[in-house]
Amino acid sequence: MFNRNLTLDQVDPDVWAAIQKEDVRQEQHIELIASENYASPAVMQAQGTQLTNKYAEGYPGKRYYGGCEYVDVVEQLAIDRLKQIFGAEAANVQPNSGSQANQGVYMAVLKPGDTVLGMSLAEGGHLTHGASVNASGKLYNFVPYGLDADEVLDYAQVERLTKEHKPKLIVAGASAYALHIDFERMARIAHDNGALFMVDIAHYAGLVAGGAYPNPVPHADFVTSTTHKSLRGPRGGVIMMKAEVEKAVNSAIFPGIQGGPLMHVIAAKAVAFKEALSPEFQDYAQQVVKNAKVLADTLVKRGLRIVSGRTESHVMLVDLRPKGITGKEAEAVLGQAHITVNKNAIPNDPEKPFVTSGIRLGTPAMTTRGFKEAEAELTANLIADVLDNPRDEANIAAVRARVNELTARLPVYGN
């Protein structure tokens, strides 16, 4: 039998030591990677439970294994709460990731070689929206759409390509697009031309849940998402859909692309969805957007360019060319100052993908730890201070000291 009193630090000191160092890093650094956030202690506790021991192939009430009466309760709670948050007719909480959620929809409604419209990765889309290096781009005939001359989603291009290529499915959503997406307009283009409409809100889900970003569920046939990022849950995926396609989607996930679901993760999803239904989460989502606006506006005042001219969400792309520094260099020097970002290509980027001319910034994590407009403005100025003098080690050290003061005042996990 196992001894409950035998803890990780005793069983595996090497793993424990690495985890402790990561805990310190998360507490000390300002996290600005748009796809990252902090899960609550309750979410992490749920994910660390004995539910990891249970196989539960199938769905609540229709399992291929015995002993599922309690995991059935947990999964049904997750389904019901997710539907309540977004107003969905049906939902599947079993996808292990956002990528698998997208793959599940594709498997449910497409055949290899079918034509699909998706946002170009180079202009803000995601790998799973038809990038040539991804399975989606290898299995299906994806036609990319992008931005217009003002770096706004080119709806006229979407309509033109739809009429020309007659896709079976149109995919909306992005990993690096700062503005609102007109889901109603996209749905009209799709449905008027006989196409199905899917929206990937992996980045925006928490904002949608909090009423700070448009909800695509009333307009789309399928809505996929991750459960981490702005939703602050465990790493995983979900699919929401119209009731008439629920059976096809469920079959695509299991037995189509997955076997037994991760019940400990589904428990953590259920907890996160309960948190997302709270008034406090509504306030959080609104603050994420407020912080992003201040961050973007301050960076512009300091001589940087924001792609699309502004942000209407949690995320922004920063064009670094005015500062004469690449995204790769900026990521490294900001990291030395304890500000964590990721290099990111900008539209029509002349640099290679591993170098880039931009960085992507997001405010979900900083907002979770209690940053408001004043801290967002300070953070933007600290970023600009580093980028103005990226090779001045004394300057970087001074910024790092100010970052450490700020993060010590507003810890991620307080008492």
UniProtKB/Swiss-Prot annotation:
Pfam families, alphabetized: SHMT (PF00464)
InterPro entries on file: PyrdxlP-dep_Trfase (IPR015424), PyrdxlP-dep_Trfase_major (IPR015421), PyrdxlP-dep_Trfase_small (IPR015422), Ser_HO-MeTrfase (IPR001085), Ser_HO-MeTrfase-like (IPR049943), Ser_HO-MeTrfase_PLP_BS (IPR019798), SHMT-like_dom (IPR039429)
Coarse class of the protein's main subcellular location: cytoplasm
Residues with site note (Plays an important role in substrate specificity): 228
Entry EC no(s): 2.1.2.1
MF-aspect GO terms: glycine hydroxymethyltransferase activity; pyridoxal phosphate binding
Cleaved signal peptide residues: none
Record's keyword terms, sorted: Amino-acid biosynthesis, Cytoplasm, One-carbon metabolism, Pyridoxal phosphate, Transferase
Sites where the protein binds (6S)-5,6,7,8-tetrahydrofolate: 121, 125-127
Compartment(s) where it occurs, according to its Swiss-Prot or TrEMBL record: Cytoplasm
Gene Ontology biological process terms in this record: glycine biosynthetic process from serine; tetrahydrofolate interconversion
CDD domains the UniProt entry points to: SHMT
List of residues that carry N6-(pyridoxal phosphate)lysine: 229
SUPFAM superfamilies according to UniProt: PLP-dependent transferases (SSF53383)
Function of the protein: Catalyzes the reversible interconversion of serine and glycine with tetrahydrofolate (THF) serving as the one-carbon carrier. This reaction serves as the major source of one-carbon groups required for the biosynthesis of purines, thymidylate, methionine, and other important biomolecules. Also exhibits THF-independent aldolase activity toward beta-hydroxyamino acids, producing glycine and aldehydes, via a retro-aldol mechanism.
Family that this chain belongs to: Belongs to the SHMT family.
Record note on quaternary structure: Homodimer.
Protein known as: Serine hydroxymethyltransferase 2
Origin species: Bordetella parapertussis (strain 12822 / ATCC BAA-587 / NCTC 13253)
UniProt lineage: Bacteria, Pseudomonadati, Pseudomonadota, Betaproteobacteria, Burkholderiales
Gene: glyA2
